[in-house]
Amino acid sequence: HQQFRDLFLQRLVAPTDVGTDRGFDVVTLDDVVGDARHPFPVAHVAERTSWSCHHGVARWGAECPDAADGRWKAPLRAALERLAGAVDAITALTFREAIGEDPADARDAYVDVVLGRTTGAAFAAERWPTADEAVRRRLLDLLEAQRWRLAMFASDGWFWDDPIRPETRQVMRAAARAARLVDGLAGTRLEHTLVADLALLTSPSRG
């Protein structure tokens, strides 16, 4: 993501004359993922890299010159990082005390519930067969909190110029959902802290 690399890519994939061989094929993500005839390698995203402008990750936590006024981004990022830390700590502690496990594998597998491939009850029964119903329900609720904790970091929430946009409001809603779920389970006041932290950011257009 360096300056003018977008022009390079534009020229690279520009339509060619019929019969001209580029030496490579232009494909979409659907072309790759939709081909189930053979497996494809896992892609790893390098830390502190971005898919947008050449200013890099500043777009997602500081003031990027390509956005008119990014002073609201650092307080928002700090608020969500603080909430994420609390949600993770409570989730890890509860899983450890209830079933003696780290929650990471269950969190990743919970996507099957989110996508409707299985029900929460079936998921819990398969993963925690010796746990009683109350424990299973509590662990499922924490995985749901983890779902929203991940959703609140959706990158489009920081991409634009103003936090009043729907993308940023959506990440705040996700954060509130995660906080409320954990507060209901653990008796914490994460939503109260989140609201106080979010009060530090202002909208360039509305103050």
Positions of PLM-derived features:
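Active-site and substrate-binding clefts of carbohydrate-active enzymes
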Residues: H1-G207
